[in-house]
């Protein structure tokens, strides 16, 4: 649910690509909004701001351009965004992320997240994550037929899981 918090004409856009339990999206709004809801059942959502013309709050915690936000299965979305806000997001199957974290990264997802919804992974890791999500969206917009191949979907899914663990 989106509720516009500032007066004026609303202009927004949502672009998404979905495959094999993965969603990559880009969302833009020109007005301050309050977003409420929940991610897909059994999923983990991660968002990274691209543009912010003010401050945001995610589940009560302050968010700036150097932060990323995350929401897991069973978590409630409570996100106040400023005017002129744009975000890139990744939603993955939480069980697949837990398995990837344990078997590939040798990390415990719950320990890595530590119940936090806002992270400051550092400029380099944040920039790499932004570039990867933008690149995946751009590549698949140009060549959507690539997703017809299950192997391509698996490679992209593994890349997305690795990228998610790199920023938390």
Predicted segment positions?
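N-terminal low-complexity or simple alpha-helical regulatory segments
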Residues: 1-49
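Short, electropositive, low-hydrophobicity segments enriched in small/polar residues
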Residues: 25, 51, 76-78
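Alpha-helical bundle regulatory/interaction domains
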Residues: 1-9, 55-168
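Non-catalytic surface loops within mature trypsin-like serine protease
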Residues: 31, 50-52, 94-96
């Amino acid at each position: 649910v989106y509720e516009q918090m500032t007066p004026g004409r609303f202009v927004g856009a949502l672009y998404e690509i979905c495959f094999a339990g993965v969603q990559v999206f880009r969302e833009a709004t020109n007005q301050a909004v309050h977003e409420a809801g929940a991610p897909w059942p059994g999923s983990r959502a991660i968002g990274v701001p691209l543009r912010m013309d003010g401050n945001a709050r995610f589940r009560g915690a302050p968010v700036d351009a150097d932060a990323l936000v995350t929401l897991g299965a069973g978590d409630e979305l409570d996100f106040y965004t400023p005017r002129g806000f744009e975000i890139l997001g990744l939603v993955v199957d939480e069980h697949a992320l837990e398995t990837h974290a344990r078997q590939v990264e040798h990390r415990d997802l719950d320990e890595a997240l530590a119940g936090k919804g806002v992270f400051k992974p550092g400029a380099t890791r944040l920039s790499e994550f932004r570039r990867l999500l933008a690149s995946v969206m751009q590549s698949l917009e140009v060549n959507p037929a690539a997703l017809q191949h299950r192997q391509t979907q698996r490679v992209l899914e593994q890349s997305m899981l690795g990228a998610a663990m790199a920023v938390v």
